[in-house]
Amino acid sequence: MSKVYDWFEERLEIQAIADDITSKYVPPHVNIFYCLGGITLTCFLVQVATGFAMTFYYRPTVTEAFASVQYIMTEVNFGWLIRSVHRWSASMMVLMTILHVFRVYLTGGFKKPRELTWVTGVVLAVLTASFGVTGYSLPWDQIGYWAVKIVTGVPEAIPVIGSPLVELLRGSASVGQSTLTRFYSLHTFVLPLLTAVFMLMHFLMIRKQGISGPL
């Protein structure tokens, strides 16, 4: 086993990377509230794992979506647990994101030179809210359907571009299969990809600049 490790160590300098990760200075003022961002990341990873598991059984059609969710909850081994963890983790992710934003704002973590870190964090907060909106509709039950209808109807109040924007969101003049397909694509591909990219940028900047000092 040591020979295998030595082979990788010689080429990748694994120990140097590990030392760099574990030896980062942590300011003495840091407390449990500085862990909220890490908890949000953990929730996101749980979301990815449980969401991926459900894609094997979920069917994104207006005629089969609700039945497929029922199938996951009643027939799939531990399906009820996977979906429940997904829902609980989603709620936790939203809560942790809100608390994290407030913590950073109240402690002045958005000030120079961390403006870009703050901007990426705000983008991540918007993406988190978008996860909630798109995921809420996927069971395609009464609550999900009417939530989508209301949310996608909001832009209609915008002058000139309101109606085209509503049609772009819905995929047609009314809420239906095109809307569900769009929301499913956003929830399972577009939003996770964007979130992963912005999280990487966010963490690299934190890694480079370190944790902000006390007020």
UniProtKB/Swiss-Prot annotation:
Q: Where does heme b 1 bind?
A: H100, H202
Which GO cellular component terms are attached? Answer: chloroplast thylakoid membrane
One MF term in the entry's GO annotations: metal ion binding
Which CDD domains did the record assign? Cytochrome_b_N
Q: Which cofactor does it need?
A: heme b; heme c
Subcellular location field = Plastid, Chloroplast thylakoid membrane
Q: How does it sit in the membrane?
A: Multi-pass membrane protein
- Report keywords, A-Z: Chloroplast, Electron transport, Heme, Iron, Membrane, Metal-binding, Photosynthesis, Plastid, Thylakoid, Transmembrane, Transmembrane helix, Transport
Q: Which residues bind heme b 2?
A: H86, H187
Q: Which HAMAP family match?
A: Cytb6_f_cytb6
Additional information = Heme 1 (or BH or b566) is high-potential and absorbs at about 566 nm, and heme 2 (or BL or b562) is low-potential and absorbs at about 562 nm.
What family does this belong to?
Answer: Belongs to the cytochrome b family. PetB subfamily.
Query: Subunit comment for this entry?
Result: The 4 large subunits of the cytochrome b6-f complex are cytochrome b6, subunit IV (17 kDa polypeptide, PetD), cytochrome f and the Rieske protein, while the 4 small subunits are PetG, PetL, PetM and PetN. The complex functions as a dimer.
Q: What is this protein called?
A: Cytochrome b6
* Annotated source species: Citrus sinensis
